[in-house]
């Protein structure tokens, strides 16, 4: 068995795998968030401000010519937040800092200039070290959005009405109206059209007329086509086309009228002449161009040729039929729409992509239209000349030319779903969009605000800045944008994945309802950039994905993945190159599994490699790059599944999603069978404490670790006062997460330990010795047990409960506010009227629960009384009040109590008033938060899962002595049904089982990296040897080891009929805990109008007895039961009160009355102006309200 021992976290693991791997390739997994936000502060804010600078303030000067003041915002600086992260969490504040502008004001007439600092701009929410934001006390994350990159796209679409194909050149800006050029290639309909702003379609040449091509020949010469005069088919097609070759013949002078050359004549007019002089080929106008021109003239130029202005007017009248078309206005509006960089913006990325896309078309244009002689050597030197971020005429003409050639060259079409055509908008860019939107609105009103200012010294720049509008924009973005999400904090992996999520939905993205299958599907360009496995199972499948483990985003937002450079069949392990999806297509790339010799050269002569989006066989000398590691295809979650290569994709998807739902356990264990990525997930989660410098541990307790720094020779480093330099690390203790989980850090070093820089010194939640530990290693057997593990149910041993194997701590927060009411302030007090003494036992003298108290449902946490409306007091009451004080005042109990179904220990109480939180809501005097920690042990109904999508619910908990046991007496801890494996095709769990058993027997931890892990034969051969050493060989076949063993029934001691597969499997407890879901209603609230019980656990509601359930009782003829269901138990108000009395007195139940829903129905019909009257059996009219 070939394994290499490596230290990961603070333990050693035996690594399988043949691919050499460097730790340096694993960058910070949250880098995308941190870098993007840093870029926003460092560059993007100023970038947005500069776009609107300088602001010009016109000044009317008496007697002189008018002058203007120029206001320029030169620089921006930021202040730290006035509250710490923890304060913001506790007090419900936003973690934000102030931004200030430096302003320069210039008098354009005199050149006088003044500068002012510290002009307050706004409060900007800051990102924490963990890559998240704290907004109103809640931790939130901004999800990265995957959007189509701006540029020009050539795509094939089916027409909605005819389902015929159509080729489209689509100009997609970051800001502005769409422009589409359409080419219908279907015979008889071959014509070029243009669609403006997704509205009307026009003849493309009408648009060119508007752009200034007023001469027919000027338009046709843009679309030349060389034809062979010997080709009869081509001749018949192009017979009526205009000749663009400039040929002179003597005979042309004799024509009527005389011609100087063939240029501009029809082909049929000069065909004989060309054949006479044996000319083999001639350039004519493209057939589609001829047809398009003909149709345009037929429709718009019946009498005379249109001018540019008239063409604009014609287009405008169709775009806005309600407005009066004026030629000049039409020209200005349409030109403004596409040729003004302020209204239409491709951005630098878009322009760059257009330059790459149309460069070849531009070279062809120079050769064919401009008649330039360009050799192949010169091609590389020719650059696309257009630099503007708006549309240019050349872009339009080249795109139309490109479209005409697409029919023959179908590879020239773009794939919408290729990652080269998509870019990532991270938090920085999304915040910039919000900032710019608010800032531009604010600047528009600047000249009005400063109108009438005569002196430069009287200009107040602060009056220009409306910081509230910018702060509102940020607040709305963080509070309500689809991309600002409540952080998924179930465990560190869930949090890490949330920060690396890619979403195709959101503003400017796709809509879930309209997203077709193709958009959601896996594409070859996702390799190493986007995980093909991790995505939700519901309506968002394929739209919400995760970044691959090594993917990073470049400055333009394109996803890149790393490769090693290969030259002359030699891999350069020191040369890592990041390639985007577009760049990757141009190279021959070998997979990471290609065998590399000790000297770094490729071993095999021929290697399967990717090139131009396909996989082919290449000689090793042709290989240009090689993948860095086999795991670069997957996300962090998927890379944590051992033997992923043996699992069906659907189950792997479930496995990676369920790991994110694993509850942090009280006693977590790192997996015996890992993949070697556990340390990475722990490192970048933000909860693992690592040593900042080399040092020796000086002091350790549950709340802090002190380390004295050492130099390379292990000598103590000292400061300027000759005191030892010490680092103090504070640990988080029992902090509540967004999902009510417990965040707790535990030291893993002892006093005297020497630690190196970056070494783990304290575990966070779901961690064990510096590695991610989401669950427990459980000794499992695959055998049916009395039907208790039917349909994925799980049988567990009492031993797991005794060991607290799946016990977890959950922290819930309950809060109350003491408000000012119209009748006086509410009061927090222990003096609560009409309450039993025992309910007050846990309260202190102020009426707030004591820390450490054990409370259960109904117990008072905070005593609070609210004043009631007092009627006019009688003289007697006044006398009582004057004698006994205010004891008889009219107050009601509004205390905070523990909700139904919750019990636990109070671990913290926080009390705030207006001094602590100046921004407390108006009318709130005191704000109290009580934290209760609940210990949840394993129970029937809890959901457990492995890492391979193998999930199930606990059906029974057996005594340890009743569990099946091994020949050496070891009992199993869990029994799974063997029928859960074959049809699910997740065989990875069986291999994990065998390797896990080997790990248990040898006390070694293993790592089997995905796509490069242990083979079945390696595991079986070693397991067979070790079993023999431990005398556990019963049931195994030495010639063909199968990993099975003879088990005995714990109840009878008899052996089972067949050997059973046993071993250690890593199991997780998911956050679907039976105790949180189980619920029964006794007496509870009713809805106001229908008077029926509310629904749902939160409202202490009942179970809905719906239409189909009524049918079921009808079918059984259970008339009385049905009657009760629809009256007493539902909405017969009078009836249910009578029943209560009858039950108390032991009498027979009364007859049911009329349900409230009947009365509601009559009221609704009356609301529809229908006169409803009710009569009894004797014909007497009844009053509905009195029934």
From Swiss-Prot:
SUPFAM superfamilies hit by this protein: beta and beta-prime subunits of DNA dependent RNA-polymerase (SSF64484)
Gene Ontology terms, MF aspect: DNA binding; DNA-directed RNA polymerase activity; ribonucleoside binding
Any one of the GO BP annotations: DNA-templated transcription
Entry EC number(s): 2.7.7.6
Domain of life per record: Bacteria
Entry annotated with the keyword Protease: no
UniProt KW keywords: DNA-directed RNA polymerase, Nucleotidyltransferase, Transcription, Transferase
Catalysed reaction equations from the record: RNA(n) + a ribonucleoside 5'-triphosphate = RNA(n+1) + diphosphate
GO cellular component: DNA-directed RNA polymerase complex
Family recorded in the similarity comment: Belongs to the RNA polymerase beta chain family.
HAMAP family named in the record: RNApol_bact_RpoB
Subunit organization: The RNAP catalytic core consists of 2 alpha, 1 beta, 1 beta' and 1 omega subunit. When a sigma factor is associated with the core the holoenzyme is formed, which can initiate transcription.
Its job: DNA-dependent RNA polymerase catalyzes the transcription of DNA into RNA using the four ribonucleoside triphosphates as substrates.
NCBIfam families tied to this protein: PRK00405.1, rpoB
Listed name of the protein: DNA-directed RNA polymerase subunit beta
């Amino acid at each position: 068995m070939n394994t290499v021992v490596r230290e990961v976290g603070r333990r050693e693991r035996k690594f399988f795998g043949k691919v050499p791997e460097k730790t340096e390739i694993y960058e910070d997994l949250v880098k995308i968030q941190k870098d993007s936000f840093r870029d926003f502060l460092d560059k993007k804010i100023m970038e947005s401000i500069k776009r609107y600078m300088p602001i010009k303030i016109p000044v009317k000067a008496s007697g002189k010519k008018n002058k203007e003041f120029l206001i320029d915002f030169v620089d921006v600086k930021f202040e730290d937040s006035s509250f710490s992260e923890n304060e913001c969490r506790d007090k419900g504040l936003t973690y934000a800092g102030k931004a200030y502008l430096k302003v320069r004001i210039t008098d354009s007439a005199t050149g006088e200039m003044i500068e002012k600092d510290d002009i307050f701009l706004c409060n900007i929410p800051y990102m924490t070290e963990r890559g998240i934001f704290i907004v109103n006390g809640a931790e939130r994350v901004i999800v990265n959005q995957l959007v189509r990159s701006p540029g020009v796209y050539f795509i094939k679409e089916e027409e909605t009405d005819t389902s015929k194909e159509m080729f489209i050149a689509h100009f997609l800006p970051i800001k502005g109206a769409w422009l589409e050029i359409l080419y219908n290639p279907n015979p008889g309909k071959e014509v070029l059209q243009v669609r403006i702003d997704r509205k009307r379609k026009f003849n493309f040449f009408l648009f060119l007329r508007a752009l200034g091509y007023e001469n027919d020949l000027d338009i046709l010469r843009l679309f030349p086509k060389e034809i062979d005069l010997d080709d009869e088919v081509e001749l018949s097609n192009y017979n009526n086309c205009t000749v663009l070759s400039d040929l002179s013949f003597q005979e042309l002078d004799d024509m009527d009228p005389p011609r100087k050359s063939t240029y501009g004549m029809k082909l049929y007019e000069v065909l004989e002449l060309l054949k006479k002089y044996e000319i083999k080929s001639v350039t004519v106008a493209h057939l589609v161009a001829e047809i398009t021109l003909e149709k345009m003239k037929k429709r718009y130029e019946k009498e005379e040729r249109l001018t540019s202005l008239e063409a604009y007017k014609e287009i405008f009248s169709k775009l806005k039929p309600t407005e009066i078309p004026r030629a000049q206005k039409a020209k200005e509006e349409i030109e403004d729409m596409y040729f003004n960089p302020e209204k239409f913006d491709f951005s630098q990325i878009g322009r760059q992509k257009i330059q790459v896309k149309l460069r070849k078309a531009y070279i062809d244009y120079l050769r064919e239209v401009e008649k330039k002689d360009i050799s192949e050597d010169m091609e590389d030197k020719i650059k696309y000349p257009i630099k503007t971020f708006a549309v240019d005429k050349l872009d339009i003409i080249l795109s139309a030319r490109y479209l005409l050639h697409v029919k023959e060259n179908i590879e020239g079409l773009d794939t919408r779903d290729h990652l080269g055509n998509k870019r990532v908008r991270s938090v920085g860019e999304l915040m910039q969009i919000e900032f710019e939107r608010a800032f531009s609105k604010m600047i528009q009103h600047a000249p009005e605000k400063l109108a009438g200012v005569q002196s430069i010294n009287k200009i107040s720049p602060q009056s220009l800045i409306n910081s509230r509008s910018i702060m509102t924009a940020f607040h709305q973005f963080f509070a309500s944008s689809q991309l600002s999400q409540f952080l998924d904090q179930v465990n560190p992996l869930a949090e890490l994945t949330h920060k690396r999520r890619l979403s195709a939905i959101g503003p400017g993205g796709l809509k879930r309802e309209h997203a077709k299958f193709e958009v959601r599907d896996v594409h070859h360009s996702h390799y190493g950039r986007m995980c093909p496995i991790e995505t939700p199972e519901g309506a968002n499948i394929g739209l919400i994905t995760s970044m691959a483990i090594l993917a990073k985003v470049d400055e333009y937002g394109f996803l890149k993945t790393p490769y090693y450079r290969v030259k002359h069949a030699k891999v350069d392990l020191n040369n890592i190159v990041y390639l985007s999806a577009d760049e990757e297509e141009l190279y021959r790339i070998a997979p990471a599994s290609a065998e590399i010799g000790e000297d770094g050269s490729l071993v095999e002569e021929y290697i399967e490699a990717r090139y131009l989006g396909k996989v082919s066989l290449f000689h090793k000398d042709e290989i240009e790059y090689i993948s860095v590691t086999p795991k670069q295809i997957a996300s962090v979650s998927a890379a944590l599944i051992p033997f992923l290569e043996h699992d069906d994709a659907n189950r792997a998807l479930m496995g990676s999603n369920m790991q994110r739902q694993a509850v942090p356990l009280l006693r977590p264990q790192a997996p015996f069978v890992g993949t070697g990525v556990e340390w990475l997930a722990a490192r970048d989660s933000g909860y693992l404490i690592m040593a900042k410098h080399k040092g020796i541990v000086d002091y350790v307790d549950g709340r802090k670790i002190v380390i004295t720094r050492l130099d390379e020779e292990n000598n103590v480093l000292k400061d300027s006062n000759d005191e030892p330099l010490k680092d103090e690390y504070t640990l988080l203790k029992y902090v509540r997460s967004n999902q009510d989980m417990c965040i707790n850090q535990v030291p893993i070093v002892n006093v005297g330990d020497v630690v190196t820089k970056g070494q783990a010194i304290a575990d966070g939640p779901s961690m064990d010795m510096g590695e991610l530990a989401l669950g427990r290693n459980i000794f499992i057997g695959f055998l049916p047990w009395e039907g208790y593990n039917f349909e994925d149910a799980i049988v567990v041993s009492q031993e797991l409960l005794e060991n607290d194997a799946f016990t977890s701590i959950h922290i819930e927060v309950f809060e109350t506010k003491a408000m000012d009411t119209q009748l006086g302030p509410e009061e927090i007090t222990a003096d609560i009227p009409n309450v039993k003494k025992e309910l007050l036992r846990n309260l202190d003298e102020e009426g707030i629960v004591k820390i450490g108290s054990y409370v259960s449902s109904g117990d008072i946490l905070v005593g609070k009384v609210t004043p009631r409306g007092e009627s006019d007091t009688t003289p007697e009451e006044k006398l009582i009040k004057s004698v006994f004080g205010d004891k008889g005042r009219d107050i009601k109990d509004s205390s905070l109590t523990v909700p139904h179904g919750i019990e636990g220990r109070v671990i913290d109480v926080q009390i705030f008033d207006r001094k602590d939180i100046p921004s407390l809501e108006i009318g709130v005097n005191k704000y109290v938060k009580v934290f209760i920690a609940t210990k949840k042990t394993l129970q029937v109904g809890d959901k457990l899962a492995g890492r391979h999508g193998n999930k199930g619910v606990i059906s029974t908990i057996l005594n340890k002595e009743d569990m099946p046991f091994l020949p050496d007496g070891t009992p199993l801890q869990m029994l799974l049904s063997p029928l859960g494996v074959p049809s699910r095709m997740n065989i990875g769990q069986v291999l994990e089982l065998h390797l896990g058993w080997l790990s248990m027997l040898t006390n070694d931890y293993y790592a089997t990296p995905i796509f490069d892990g242990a083979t079945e034969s390696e595991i079986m051969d070693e397991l067979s040897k070790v079993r023999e050493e431990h005398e556990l060989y019963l049931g195994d076949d030495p010639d063909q080891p199968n990993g099975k063993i003879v088990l005995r029934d714990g109840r009878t001691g008899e052996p089972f009929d067949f050997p059973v597969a046993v071993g250690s499997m890593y199991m997780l407890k998911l956050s679907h805990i039976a105790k949180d879901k189980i619920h029964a209603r006794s007496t509870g609230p009713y809805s106001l109008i229908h008077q029926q019980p509310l629904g749902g656990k939160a409202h202490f509601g009942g179970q809905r007895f719906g239409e189909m359930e009524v049918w079921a009782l009808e079918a059984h003829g259970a008339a009385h039961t049905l009657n009760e269901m629809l009256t007493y138990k539902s909405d017969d108000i009078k009836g249910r009160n009578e029943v209560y009395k009858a039950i108390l007195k032991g009498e027979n139940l009364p007859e049911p009355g009329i349900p409230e829903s009947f009365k509601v129905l009559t009221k609704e019909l009356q609301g529809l102006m229908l006169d409803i009257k009710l009569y009894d059996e004797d014909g007497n009219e009844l009053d509905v309200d009195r029934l």
